[in-house]
Amino acid sequence: MKELFDVVSEKCSEKVTKSYSTSFSMATKMLATSIQQDIYNIYGFVRLSDEIVDSLHDYDKELLFNRFEEDLKNSIKEKISLNPILNSFQHTFHKYSFDIELVNSFMKSMRWDLHKKKYSNKTDYNEYIYGSADVVGLMCLNVFVDGDTKKYNELKQYAMSLGSAFQKVNFLRDLKNDFENLNRSYFPKVNFFDFSENDKNNIIAEIEKDFKNGLKGIFLLPNNSRFGVYTAYKYYFSLLKKLKKTPSKFILSTRIRIPNYAKMGLLAESYFNYHFNTYK
């Protein structure tokens, strides 16, 4: 019966991924079939954690987060959880022998979102990004290299750069919602009451540097994941280019996005670039 519950748990993680993120789902479908489920399992866990701190405003979020964290610890210890999302995540956690530090750092950053509203220095900012994004990239990297420690260490810095780039693009895209609805400001030393073109351009230059380093690592990924990760890169880099063209005052007043029809165009472009070795 545990086998059936595991199948149901994995279906839940897949459903969460496809319901919350069309872009991530599209990129995951470009991975080898053998590893897609493990990426769904990771994303489902990440998404559920984020949902608690970002969306459930009518409930005691700290209480819910504490319960969730306790359930997470027990699921890893006992190798089962009645929460299907945690049950599928713990399966992937043990399958690839994740370092528990990755999970702990992620949960630390999520907990900061309950109370910490402003990041006034680079140290806290970098620590938050490491916990909220870089470690997720490292979990996925574990899956891509099938637990190969040597390969993991070779690609670690690139996975972190790509995770940082993706997260910073999210921050810039969600500036309006984070600032107005969640009262959060992630970028240090930026006055969001007077968000200037110079502020925007400095942030974009930082993100472009992360993308440049992250792209180097995509070339070195195994065949099982290279195209899928490149597809995700193309989506986020295209979103960054769109943000770059958008005046700073509009970034604070609207949410910039890539329409679904354009995502399909990016997928086709990614396929062409990948198969003809014209990465950009």
Annotate each PLM feature.
Residues 1-168, 172-280:
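Catalytic cores of Mg2+-dependent Asp-rich isoprenoid enzymes
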